């Protein structure tokens, strides 16, 4: 499907597990169907948010803007820290949390499920990559189906949330799940991400296999002039705003000469 956004809803709903999300030639996760296993139930089309777009008229709803009062939370978050506060409160109320972490070994973003605050710090901050959400979403469905008291809050991109919303409605589980989608301007290709890491390895000494601390939107120096910051256990560091400004200064100077 040309308009496919890679939300994974078709893979999650498939009763035969014959739809898998695979990286295509352009570096994006897209569904790949095993036609031999398909039973033509059409559930994949029924939950597809590209086929069934449920638009919201913003003039008909009340909207609020907010941010975390505690500066530490805002600093550690990509924006105002509201997602973290929602997750904290949800845990207190007994909800399971489904959000995005970064897998340093595989160098990709992945949805993970949590049921307590321990480990949830991995959810903090945006991951500007297409996340692998299907396994976590399927686990959410299993939890909801086998435990009538289980509730969840799911965080994701608009297409992922639209897709899982259709799945939950189809499964009659929607009432026990809170959905939170984030602003999204599109995700880069994993081919580009792989090339970037190769450059970091060769040019900046960020060797494969070493533990990294990756912040996609570091606000150490400024909220608006943010940058990506990467630190490894070998003390190599990349992304400091001083390095960036120095490079920009050199470029500007050379242009004037």
Labelled PLM ranges:
Residues 3-4, 73:
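Short secondary-structure boundary micro-motifs
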Residues 6, 40, 153-154:
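Conserved SAM-binding loop
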Residues 53-254:
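Iron-sulfur-associated redox domains of electron-transfer enzymes in respiratory
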């Amino acid at each position: 499907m040309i308009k496919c956004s890679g939300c994974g809803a078709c893979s999650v709903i498939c009763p035969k597990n014959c739809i898998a999300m695979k990286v295509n030639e352009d570096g994006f996760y897209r569904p790949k169907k095993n036609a031999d296993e398909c039973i033509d139930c059409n559930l994949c089309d029924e939950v597809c948010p590209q086929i069934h777009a449920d638009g919201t008229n913003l003039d008909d709803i009340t909207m609020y803007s907010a941010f975390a009062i505690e500066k530490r939370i805002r600093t550690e978050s990509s924006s105002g820290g509201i997602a973290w506060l929602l997750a904290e409160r949800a845990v207190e109320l007994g909800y399971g949390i489904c959000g995005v972490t970064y897998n340093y070994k595989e160098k990709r973003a992945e949805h993970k499920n949590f049921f307590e605050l321990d480990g949830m710090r991995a959810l903090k901050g945006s991951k500007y990559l297409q996340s692998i959400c299907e396994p976590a979403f399927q686990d959410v469905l299993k939890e909801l189906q086998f435990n009538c008291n289980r509730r969840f809050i799911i965080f994701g991109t608009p297409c992922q949330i639209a897709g899982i919303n259709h799945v939950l409605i189809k499964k009659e589980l929607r009432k026990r799940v809170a959905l939170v989608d984030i602003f999204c301007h599109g995700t880069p290709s994993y081919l580009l991400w792989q090339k970037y890491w190769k450059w970091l390895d060769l040019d900046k000494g960020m060797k494969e296999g070493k533990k990294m601390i990756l912040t996609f939107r570091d606000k150490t120096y400024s909220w608006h002039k943010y940058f990506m910051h990467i630190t490894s256990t070998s003390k190599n560091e990349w992304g400091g705003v001083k390095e960036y400004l120095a490079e920009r200064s050199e470029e500007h100077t050379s242009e004037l000469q």
